[in-house]
Every structure is written in structure tokens, then in C-alpha cells.
């Protein structure tokens, strides 16, 4: 696998692999998608600048797992968030690459790394806050979201911290236990009351966009898997979600577009996301 080759310091940089990623990006551009989400450990770090230039040219945001990086016998698992933006004074488009460092490596992932006398550098070790996991809150074009990398989702504490603050959770995965993660994503969507955008490798499947709604309506898009990586487009309605969240229970019960918001959900968060005033003094 690409992971095995990467940790053995013989990374796959074949033209075929480049073509596969390029086809996903080209499909997103062709379909006029706002954002493309790709799985964990998907994109080599050397290709990120090229990807960023494509993003700024086409006004496309990308969230992608970065292939494991080895520095001084330490292994890092990063997720790149590439956000295009227009410079206010010149009207020129640029893009910024932001990184999330995986806080919790999967046990098997860590075992394979340590079997090669390497050290899995979890985000909690590489950040200033040694005892707490670190996650980021992103705002792009009025869309508030956060990113989790695979095994991080198994932490109840970690996946609950952004309730009321986000429109969506983006989960990048390389995971064979699709049933377990399916249960997590469905619970997370209702507990945090947000959209969940989950992408897994085509080998294992269950990439999806889900919402906190009735079982028969919850999946906006769901892909079982296959031999080839493909890009599919789904649409989320931020205004519809926020308007629902701003209602009291009686109004939500009559609406029925989504499941009611959970206890302790702060409706003011939806109001501030809508107005773009989150964290303003």
C-alpha cells in the first residue's frame, strides 16, 4: 500500500497516482463544487503547492489527508485544509494551506510505525498543550467547520467540543471498520446537530454526507465503495440548518426538517454563524 511504501521511505510518486488525484480535482472543478474532501493519507506533501494553485484558480476549497511524513524518525499524520480567498484591495485570488496534526493514531497504525523503530508523533505531543488534543475551527465564505482524522472520532470528549459552533464536521478516514464509524458519524450528526461529511478510501467505502434528520432522510449522499476512486457531489443547506436551530423546541417539532437540537445546544451559535459575528467582541 501507499502507507507501507511511505513508512519504508520508498513513497509512491507514480504518474498513475498523480492522475487519480488530478481526476478527483478535475471532477470537482467540472461540477462546480465549492469544496472537495479526500481521504486520510491521500495526497503527498510535494503535490500540495500544485493543488493549492488549482484551488485559487478555480475558487475550490480542498480538505485532504496528507501522506505520512517522516522527519528524524518521527512520523506525522497531517490533514491539509486549502482555502482560496480574494484579496480585498487587488481582487487577486490566493490560497492558504492550513494543517491539522492527528491527535490520536489508530493502534494498528501506531504498531506498524513503531515496528520500524519510528515514533508516531501525535498532535498532543507536537503541540504546546501537552495534555489536551488540539483541533481547529475554520470559517470560509460563511461556512463554519472542523476536521477530524479517522481514529480521533472515537474520542467522545474530542468530538463534542464544537457543539453550537459549526455547520459541519469533516471526517477524513482510511478505515476498514465501516460499521463502527457509521454509528459514530450518525450519532455525531445528531449529538452536535450538524452536517457530517465523511470520506473514506474507495477500497472500504461508506463515504457520505449526512444530516441530523430522520433515518430515512439523513443521508444526502452515500457511496458504498469500489475499485476506483471517484468524486461525487452533494449539497448541504446551511441556512435551512441554522434557521431550524434558532427555533425553540415547539417550532422545531412543527418543522420536522431535522431532529430537535439536543440539551445544552446554544441557539445563539446558529444566529452568530448566520450573521458572521462569531467571536466578535
Q: For the regions a protein language model found, what residue spans apply to each?
A:
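Active-site-proximal beta-strand elements of phosphoester/diester hydrolases
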Residues: 1-10, 143-152, 170-172
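Cys-nucleophile CN-hydrolase/nitrilase-fold catalytic domain and related Cys-dependent amidase chemistry
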Residues: 12-100, 175-177, 190-194
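Sequence-level detector for tyrosine residue identity
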Residues: 15-18, 76, 85, 99, ...
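Short, surface-exposed connector motifs at secondary-structure boundaries
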Residues: 30-36, 139-144, 164-169
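CN hydrolase (nitrilase-like) catalytic-core segments centered on the catalytic cysteine
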Residues: 46-67, 144, 153-262, 280
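Active-site catalytic loop in hydrolytic enzyme cores
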Residues: 74-164, 184
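Cysteine/selenocysteine-centered motifs that mediate thiol-based redox chemistry or coordinate metal-sulfur cofactors
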Residues: 125-142, 146-149, 247-281
Amino acid at each position: 500500500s501507499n502507507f507501507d511504501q511511505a513508512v519504508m521511505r520508498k513513497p509512491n510518486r507514480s504518474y498513475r497516482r498523480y492522475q487519480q488525484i488530478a481526476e478527483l480535482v478535475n471532477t470537482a472543478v467540472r461540477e462546480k463544487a465549492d469544496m472537495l474532501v479526500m481521504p486520510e493519507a491521500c495526497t503527498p506533501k510535494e503535490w500540495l503547492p500544485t493543488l493549492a494553485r488549482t484551488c485559487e484558480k478555480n475558487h475550490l476549497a480542498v480538505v485532504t489527508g496528507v501522506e505520512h511524513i517522516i522527519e528524524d524518525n518521527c512520523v506525522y499524520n497531517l490533514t491539509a485544509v486549502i482555502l482560496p480567498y480574494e484579496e480585498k484591495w487587488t481582487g487577486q485570488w490566493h490560497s492558504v494551506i492550513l494543517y491539522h496534526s492527528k491527535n490520536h493514531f489508530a493502534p494498528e497504525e501506531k504498531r506498524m510505525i513503531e515496528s520500524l523503530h519510528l515514533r508516531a508523533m501525535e498532535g498532543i505531543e507536537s503541540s504546546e498543550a501537552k495534555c489536551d488534543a488540539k483541533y481547529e475551527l475554520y470559517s470560509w465564505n460563511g461556512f463554519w467547520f472542523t476536521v477530524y482524522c479517522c481514529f480521533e472520532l472515537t474520542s467522545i470528549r474530542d468530538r463534542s467540543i464544537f457543539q453550537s459552533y459549526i455547520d459541519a464536521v469533516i471526517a477524513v478516514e482510511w478505515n476498514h471498520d465501516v460499521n463502527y464509524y457509521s454509528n459514530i458519524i450518525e450519532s455525531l450528526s445528531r449529538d452536535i446537530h450538524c452536517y457530517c461529511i465523511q470520506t473514506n478510501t474507495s477500497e472500504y467505502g461508506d463515504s457520505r454526507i449526512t444530516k441530523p434528520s430522520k433515518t430515512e432522510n439523513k443521508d444526502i449522499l452515500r457511496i458504498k465503495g469500489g475499485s476506483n476512486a471517484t468524486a461525487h457531489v452533494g449539497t448541504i443547506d446551511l441556512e435551512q440548518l441554522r434557521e431550524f436551530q434558532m427555533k425553540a423546541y415547539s417550532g422545531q417539532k412543527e418543522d420536522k426538517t431535522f431532529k430537535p437540537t439536543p440539551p445544552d445546544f446554544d441557539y445563539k451559535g446558529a444566529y452568530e454563524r448566520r450573521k458572521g459575528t462569531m467571536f466578535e467582541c
